[in-house]
Amino acid sequence: MEDDLNTLAPLGPAAWLFVCPRQDEWCDVLAALSLCDRSSSVAIAPLLVDLTVDRDFQVAVRTPISRYEGGVLTKVTSMWPAAFVFHNAEAIVSRTEDHGDVGGLCAEARARFGVASYRAEAERADTDFTELWAALGVDGARVVMYAVVGYGLKELLYAGQLVPCVEEARTVLLGAVEAFKLPLYPATLFADGDATADGAAAVGLRSRTPFVDRRGLYVSALSEALFYYVFTALGQALRFGHTEHLIDEGMKQFLQDTQNSVKLAPQKRYYGYLSQKLTPGERDQLLLCDAIACELAFSFASVYFDSAYEPAPLMNYSEWPLVRAAEGHADLLRRLSELKLHLSAHVGALVFSGNSVLYQTRIAFFSAANKVPAGGTAQDGLLKAVQFCNGLTCLTEDALNDACRTVKFEGPGGGGGGRDEQFTPQHLAWACATSPHLMSDLVWYLNRLAIYNTGQNGGSALYEHLVHCAVNLCPACRGRCCQSCYQTAFVRIQTRLPPLPKQLKREPFVLTLFSRFLCDVDVLGTFGKRYAGDAKEPSAASLAAAPGEARKVGDEAGLGAGGGGPGGRLGVNVDRLKYFNQILDYCKRNSLIDPSTGEDTLAVRGRADFMSALSGLNRCVDEAAMALVSEVRMKSNRDEVAGATQAFNLDLNPYAVAFSPLLAHQYYRAFFLIVQNLALVSASSYVVDNPLTVSSLSRWLLQHFQSICGAFASNSARKGLLFTKDAKCSKSVEFERFMDFALYAASGRHVLLSTETKLCKLSVCMLRTCRVKNRPIPRGGKGLPVSVFFKRDVVQRRNPVRGCLAFLLYAFHERLFPGCGLSCLDFWQKVYHNALPKSVAIGKMEEFNAFVKYVLNVTTEYNEHDLIDVPPSNLLSYVEYRFHNKFLCFYGFGDYLSTLHGLSTKLVPQNHLNFPHLLAASPKFASVAEYVLYFKKLKLDGVPPPHVATFSRESLVRSVFENRSLVTVAFGIEKYSTSGGSREVFHFGQIGYFAGNGVERSLNVNSMGGGDYRYMRQRFVLATRLVDLLLRRSRRETVLFDADLLRTRVLAALESHDTQLDPELAAIAEIMDGRGGEPPEYEDVLFFVDGQECLAASIVGKIKELIKKGVEDFSLTALGADAGAGGGPAGSAGGPESGGGAGAAGGEGTYDLSALFLDVENECVVLEGPTAAALDGGGDGDECAFPAKRLRL
């Protein structure tokens, strides 16, 4: 059902001027959330209710744009998600961190890379607000003024063609602050005469009447901030460098409806072509695709954003939990700073990923991919050949113009002769559209990100830089603020910066968006999942008549068909979750899992309880898996299972990230990249059928652009990736009280009249979501085997303490082996290697043997079927993994799955030394030793440690979406055509990887461990849960950071086969080496032990005990001696009082446990109950074949 446009977008102004009293606390909050730089007198604040706008503020309106005889024409637009503070912004800017001469850095980047610079209108002075202040009765020195503007009117604000109407000022509340807001009307409403063809032609940057010159809102500093933050950024996304022409055409597009005309191509230049080896035909095709993508994205940005959106829940500042929970103003500022620390992890991913959306500004032709597939068309080959990629290496190349002639680059190092070798501050400034506001904000985040040391420099590079700054030799700030300037920030994170690509690569792109709640991200995703529309199974006749139409591709009620093929509907006959819910019901009845939180509630008093509870649970899981196999064989087929798809949605509402102007900037970059990727579908069709035969690209576009626009409008949305919705106007003509604009322009008299209003366009299209998918079950190409990364040729034998029961063995170690005296890891290491000393109390030998054999059998059986290759961390994940592993193996699948993982941000304390921004003033240290001593004194004085955002793995990835998270994800846009006569092209977002070693340590590949391809099978979503905050490797150069090396040593220690050595003590010795007795954070230990939560908790607990005992020497020798003297294995572990069994009371040597392992080595599967009976068919065939034989009937 379509929404009513009259309700979504009421009549009213689409630009407002706010006049707010200067209040310290209000300015403090804005300083924390806004984009500011000391070089600019403008601040860019977030668009938030009760902070910058009032509660009655409308984010979508039908705004008057011109007059006709007897009435006013209106058009729908939505607000740009930011407020631009231009008067007394120093009250905000002065409260922010100084980052050096960022304005100078941006100017250097413009000169170096040929970016257009802002040119103020020399003949025009800034608006004098004296009369306005007098009319409002305010003191201009005591107020802050800012503008909020609609997407369609942003060009008018830049050009000073919005007229404030003080007569219509109204008083509003911004939280507890009382302010004024005045409407800003477009200059076209005050033009001489009604709207005519002649009057329309007068629209432009320099087309103003004397009235607008006199009364229009024009502030040069505001126009300059808009020039870079808004328009240069849009131009970069479109690969268009003539910024003033872009602004001029954007103004005409909104006021004159020129969406279907060619606007940018005559002035466009094409970079990155001369360094590609292309045939003339390939070059022409690429040029045309480039031009079409640029024009379509520019046109349809107006279609999508001059639309009617609803405000996002995140926009209500006063309802943020962190605001409501704040105990005073200082606590509020601390919480806002913590919010930004969470965001820093996402900002870091955008900066450190070589495939970040900030760098994807080049369009390239991959000739090797331009092959027509069997049964395909030339368009299919072109779709695969034309791709977007990293554009940092072509910034100084010569270009081609509209006539395909070479235009020399005018900057230094032009023509490609000065290719950069490494990422510099100028490259980041370019990626920020050379906006000082954006660049300065990024520096704030870079100053608070963790340092990744490589072992070659350690932290010494930072310390030496800061000592060097003592003589005022810092190039960024000349010694003014070396503790926080951009040069110091780059020295801190130098090892994490992305390398400049040496060759073109087709890669997924990294972006940050708000996630939607609806997702299908469990092991098999959409397969066998019933939705609201699937309450009744479709008849056989309906399936036969329209197998692919049972659910529309874009149905928001479900993320896809039950199976994964193009038709993919048979799988919906199967209700997979019915069987999984039976398992959950069993867990609830037996008090194994808390039904509300999902946490473990299993109570174990001893080994018998443990085996009984686990046997019953395993029996229930296996029976459910077998029942699902039976149903699938009756109602579905193997292809439907193989086509399972995991999917989740990203919110494309522009206000979903309105709380951060930096993320709002990135949102528009992401939008333009997505839309241009989809534009290539329409482009490829016309380019293949209509080769370039005219003298210029713009002439070709003039011939075909209207047809291309129509094709794009029909095939861009609801084809698998992008989803939109429409809203229509129920009545096109209304009467509203507007002032007499002509009289106001002529005499200044303000008279309200009942005016007829007509809406120019009766329907609008709104962006909803972008869908990202992953196929968990790998498939090779046609006739090709599955990739080696997914091949499961060998089933690894695992120590139980590293297997599926590890979380239980750690949790109940003291109850299973009371008085043992060994840590859980050390105990099972010795058991597994048949080296358990007789001095260890194990109870009765027969019970002990039975228990160990049971644990070994369950672990081995699980490993035989483990296709997920991710150790469970609790009972909920254990039953989910076991259920799906069993089902897939019983059904004949034997290769590893591709898995989705969620990593959520956490704030952890760090060493003061690595965060010089803690210094109150620019450092004046004579040596590194003096620097180190100063920071040690800070710590002793009680200065709180700085915190950084790090990631921890979620046990279930769906919790990322259920907790309404901000997510950073990498995905590519895949396109494929149907095989029928319609030849429709569909597309989907395929989740990918982050390019670069500095993004997040959990994503890095340890090159020292060959043959383990888990990193190629795992895909990650980086997330920050906003609930409780704002809502109730292609082969790459590998850099080994110190943390990676330490992790390798810790894992090697834990894997040691030396039974005379406690593995946990060996790990502790590695972790504590060089720390000076300082305990590590739990999250760091969790990283070192490869995410094994139970083991990490055990190690952290043991370290705390050792420190509490006063241990200062953490060498392995000292720790071993301390353990022996303190009642370790050789001490108090034995003895009748602790339940020691045979030989435990002072025996020597080791227990002989070899008999426990004989059966395990000869058995493949150990099942219980009906499942075991079902599989007990004899014979030497593959165990996965037994269910097939049993179920053929």
From Swiss-Prot:
Assembly and interaction partners: Homooligomers. Forms double-helical filaments necessary for the formation of replication compartments within the host nucleus. Interacts with the origin-binding protein. Interacts with the helicase primase complex; this interaction stimulates primer synthesis activity of the helicase-primase complex. Interacts with the DNA polymerase. Interacts with the alkaline exonuclease; this interaction increases its nuclease processivity.
Pfam families membership: Viral_DNA_bp (PF00747)
Compartments (UniProt record): Host nucleus
Function text: Plays several crucial roles in viral infection. Participates in the opening of the viral DNA origin to initiate replication by interacting with the origin-binding protein. May disrupt loops, hairpins and other secondary structures present on ssDNA to reduce and eliminate pausing of viral DNA polymerase at specific sites during elongation. Promotes viral DNA recombination by performing strand-transfer, characterized by the ability to transfer a DNA strand from a linear duplex to a complementary single-stranded DNA circle. Can also catalyze the renaturation of complementary single strands.
UniProt short sequence motif Required for filament formation, positions renumbered to this chain: 827-828
An example Gene Ontology CC term for this record: host cell nucleus
Transmembrane segments: none
Keyword DNA-binding: yes
Superkingdom field: Viruses
GO molecular function term, any single one: single-stranded DNA binding
Main localisation: host cell
Protein name: Major DNA-binding protein
GO biological process: DNA replication
Alphabetically ordered keywords of this record: DNA replication, DNA-binding, Host nucleus
Residue ranges, annotated region (Disordered): 1125-1145
Gene: DBP
Chain residue ranges for the region called Required for nuclear localization: 1170-1193
InterPro entries: DBP_sf (IPR035989), Viral_ssDBP_head (IPR043031), Viral_ssDNA-bd (IPR000635)
Similarity field: Belongs to the herpesviridae major DNA-binding protein family.
